[in-house]
């Protein structure tokens, strides 16, 4: 079992992408910005909040936003 989530995505351009994780109540618990290159990209979320605390079991939402398009995916954490 891993405490990490590998997030893989494709980009058409060199662009800045904002990643956010929200809890079921819509509160942002973690966020970062990443520079993306054309093609496949990936990064690892360590399963922690912005304060470095491990998040508890539950439903979360990952949002990727490049300024033109926003994608949201549901994440279920089971500890």
Question: How does the language model describe each region?
Answer:
Residues 1-23, 41-46:
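Glycine-centered coil/turn sites that cap beta-strands in beta-rich domains
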């Amino acid at each position: 079992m891993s405490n990490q989530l590998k997030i893989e995505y494709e980009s058409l351009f060199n662009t800045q992408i904002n990643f956010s994780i929200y809890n079921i109540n819509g509160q942002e618990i973690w966020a970062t910005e990443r520079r993306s290159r054309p093609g496949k990209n990936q990064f690892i979320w360590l399963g922690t909040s912005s304060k470095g605390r491990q998040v508890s079991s539950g439903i979360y939402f990952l949002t990727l936003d490049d300024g033109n398009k926003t994608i949201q995916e549901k994440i279920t954490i089971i500890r």
